[in-house]
Amino acid sequence: MTGLALLYSGVFVAFWACALAVGVCYTIFDLGFRFDVAWFLTETSPFMWSNLGIGLAISLSVVGAAWGIYITGSSIIGGGVKAPRIKTKNLVSIIFCEAVAIYGIIMAIVISNMAEPFSATDPKAIGHRNYHAGYSMFGAGLTVGLSNLFCGVCVGIVGSGAALADAQNPSLFVKILIVEIFGSAIGLFGVIVAILQTSRVKMGD
């Protein structure tokens, strides 16, 4: 068994062991009602959901950007050994990957500016508006984070191919760059959808 397969199996076993332990404890102490999804959604603060959305927006976007830069950068450095001329021109791919992280930062700032304080602590007093705002911010952060994660990987793989193709045949660079531009638009789609998700958000008393 390889190291990666061992890691996956360890995570799988640990997850189900924790789930079993929690289930047994809840059964013994008569806390089974806490498995109720509605209870969980109403007892958690909308601020938790909004902060989770902010964290997911920035963290997943940065992971996507870093992953894409890693994939592209290694190919540029490797191909630049044989064809040094590709190093400067293919930095465009690195910029496209970095733009993915910028999308996440922008959306995190937008979401954080929408979070307004409220004085209520009881679920009924908090109201549907604040819960809707918290869930919308979480959904927006998850949307932009996941779209930027896959966008970064997409741009990184295409940028890697562009660097290696340019090293072999310079006329291929512009053609592959068009594919890379369309790949980078995936992250922009995520930002647009996230803005639409939070367009009706109103939090506060």
Swiss-Prot record:
Q: Which domain of life is it from?
A: Eukaryota
Q: Cross-referenced CDD domains, in alphabetical order?
A: ATP-synt_Vo_c_ATP6F_rpt1, ATP-synt_Vo_c_ATP6F_rpt2
Task: Write out the topological domains of type Cytoplasmic.
Answer: 25-51, 112-137, 197-205
Source species taxonomy: Eukaryota, Metazoa, Chordata, Craniata, Vertebrata
Q: How does it assemble?
A: V-ATPase is a heteromultimeric enzyme made up of two complexes: the ATP-hydrolytic V1 complex and the proton translocation V0 complex. The V1 complex consists of three catalytic AB heterodimers that form a heterohexamer, three peripheral stalks each consisting of EG heterodimers, one central rotor including subunits D and F, and the regulatory subunits C and H. The proton translocation complex V0 consists of the proton transport subunit a, a ring of proteolipid subunits c9c'', rotary subunit d, subunits e and f, and the accessory subunits ATP6AP1/Ac45 and ATP6AP2/PRR. Interacts with IFITM3.
Single GO biological process annotation from the record = proton transmembrane transport
Q: Does the keyword Transmembrane apply?
A: yes
**Topological domain ranges for the Lumenal compartment:** 1-3, 73-90, 159-175
One GO cellular-component annotation of the UniProt record comes to: lysosomal membrane
Spell out the protein name for this chain. V-type proton ATPase 21 kDa proteolipid subunit c''
InterPro entries noted in UniProt: ATPase_proteolipid_c-like_dom (IPR002379), ATPase_proteolipid_csu (IPR000245), F/V-ATP_Csub_sf (IPR035921)
Q: Please give the annotated consequence of changing V155M.
A: In a breast cancer sample; somatic mutation
